[in-house]
Amino acid sequence: MRTRVIVNGANGKMGILACETLENHEQFEVVAKLSRQDNLGQSILDTKAQIVVDLTRADCVYENSLTIINHGARPVIGTSGLVETQIDELTKLCKIKQIGGIIAPNFSLGAILMMMLAAKASEYFSEVEIIEGHHQQKLDAPSGTALKTAEMMAAARKKPKNKLPLKELTPGARGGSHHDINIHSLRLPGLLARQEVLFGNIGETLSITHNSIDRRCFMPGIVLACQKVLNLTNLVYGLEHLL
């Protein structure tokens, strides 16, 4: 018997590809393709969906996640925009409900490896900044990938970065700071998703870069998340925990 999956945000570019990928996979059945005007909770009840893949927008992803969990389905969240307090609340709710879930800042294997390598490098380099770039239809900044990368590096680093007495002549020139790591966000035509983690040391720099050039690079990660979430009883933040 195939696993019943709803794709929420099915009319977007990622959603269309996700539907195509899951429909062509022997393990899954896409039982509903939802957009903004559809009733997510009622659709879960009507279809008896086991998994909801959310590929919507930052301004509704938290409410969608609550709806999915409270209606007994397992969330696979590929939408950025969740803040740490919201992730904490969703983690608690999944624990109470004994429902597995996955929040994936990035579904690309290459991007996940980039984050893991950046975390490893942070053990040796304390001076680092992140430059992320996306297409202009991405309305939130910084990206979930950049935030997750900063969190992983902050957890791995062994000494604090230097505190420089800099004065910004233009406010925001040094980017935003997350876990004491500066992040610079680009939104340009011609980009899909790109991130560079740039480390500096005396007499040298180290750059770790990932560039997504086709949304199909995210599809194996969506399949993996849908396969793994069925065996979870807790919320997992980051696909690196499932590799």
Swiss-Prot record:
Positions with a binding annotation for (S)-2,3,4,5-tetrahydrodipicolinate: 135, 144-145
PROSITE patterns, sorted: DAPB
GO molecular function: 4-hydroxy-tetrahydrodipicolinate reductase; NAD binding; NADP binding; oxidoreductase activity, acting on CH or CH2 groups, NAD or NADP as acceptor
Keyword terms, alphabetized: Amino-acid biosynthesis, Cytoplasm, Diaminopimelate biosynthesis, Lysine biosynthesis, NAD, NADP, Oxidoreductase
Keyword NADP annotated: yes
EC number(s) on file: 1.17.1.8
Pathway: Amino-acid biosynthesis; L-lysine biosynthesis via DAP pathway; (S)-tetrahydrodipicolinate from L-aspartate: step 4/4
Compartment(s) of residence: Cytoplasm
Active site residues of this protein: 134 (proton donor/acceptor), 138 (proton donor)
Coiled coil: none
UniProt catalytic activity: (S)-2,3,4,5-tetrahydrodipicolinate + NAD(+) + H2O = (2S,4S)-4-hydroxy-2,3,4,5-tetrahydrodipicolinate + NADH + H(+); (S)-2,3,4,5-tetrahydrodipicolinate + NADP(+) + H2O = (2S,4S)-4-hydroxy-2,3,4,5-tetrahydrodipicolinate + NADPH + H(+)
Primary location recorded for the protein, binned into one broad class: cytoplasm
Cellular component aspect of the GO annotation: cytosol
Xref: SUPFAM superfamilies: Glyceraldehyde-3-phosphate dehydrogenase-like, C-terminal domain, NAD(P)-binding Rossmann-fold domains
CDD domains: DHDPR_N (cd02274)
Enzyme class: oxidoreductase
A GO BP annotation: diaminopimelate biosynthetic process
UniProt: NAD(+) binding residues: 9-14, 78-80, 104-107
Alphabetical list of Pfam families matching this protein: DapB_C, DapB_N
Keyword Oxidoreductase: yes
Function: Catalyzes the conversion of 4-hydroxy-tetrahydrodipicolinate (HTPA) to tetrahydrodipicolinate.
Family classification: Belongs to the DapB family.
Stated name of the protein: 4-hydroxy-tetrahydrodipicolinate reductase
Encoding gene (name): dapB
